Amino acid sequence: MKKTSKKSVQNYENNEIIKQEINLQFHWYLASFFVIFFGSLIIPAIILMVYVMLFYLPSFLETKSFILLFTQLKPFLASLFMPLIIILCYLIHIFIVGLITRWFWRITERKSPSKTGIIPRNIPSKTLNYYHIRSFMIKYPKNAVIRGPFPWLINFLYNFVGTNKIGKGTTIEEQFGADKFVDIGKNSYIGVNSGFSSHAVEGIFGNIAYAKIKLGDNVTTAALNCLAPGVEINDNSSLFPLAGATKYSTLKGDNYYYGVPLRKIFKKKVSHYAGITEEQLNEADSLFNKSSAKEENKQGE
């Protein structure tokens, strides 16, 4: 017994976690934010000021007669193009935000790639530091898009920066979380205030469980759905409101799910929740099967 205990102690000492000293501190957070925020405003600000000073100011603001604003062509064009210029500047701003964030994101991925596993918090860790930097870095770009006039550009932002992979035809409503390490297939709908968290802190000072969340094609999360790290939902799945999945849950798909933790819902409960008959539900299923068969035939041709 003593020999085995000594061997186990030696194995534990040999397999202990290697401590990694790092130099990255809060100045990287501030630097990334200021570069992304102010760097993305330079070109749009120049375009807007040039338009205002050279065209809008002399053609519209300096017009002495109020009647001339509606009777002459120049004041009319100046006022007409002003909203378009503002929209153009906003789109350029969003593109540059994504471009700078993508550049920073790729640097951090080269230093410490994102991967599934447990990130310790009780020792200095390069993985932990870059995880926090990436989490902070994506916050402003995400909110600048999803709370702006064109929230559907969030798909472009995620794919362009490389934080998430979003398929074609997928709609993402305003949500919390879900800004990194998420893979969503085609023609899916992510409902309002759905929370996809690819990380979970195990207690106040515990380790961080970090794992990719994967959703297949034609997946619907109605609203207020929470998915934990490592959740995998296969094709043709529909989640009822307030349904949630615990860590590393896997759903086979082709069904409706409800509750916490997620579980299948049968046709009687579906008709009860939706207020429809089973015949109407069967008709909807047949229409869906026909449309999916047509799409498969088109792709085959």
Question: For each predicted feature, which ranges?
Answer:
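Terminal amphipathic alpha-helical/low-complexity segments used for targeting or macromolecular assembly
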Residues: M1-F156, F160, K268-E301
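Membrane-proximal soluble helical/coiled-coil segments
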Residues: Y130-E232, N236
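Glycine-centered flexibility motif
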Residues: G98, P113-I118, G167, G216, ...
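Solvent-exposed, charged interface segments at domain starts and junctions
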Residues: Y90-K115, T163-K180, G185-K186, V192, ...
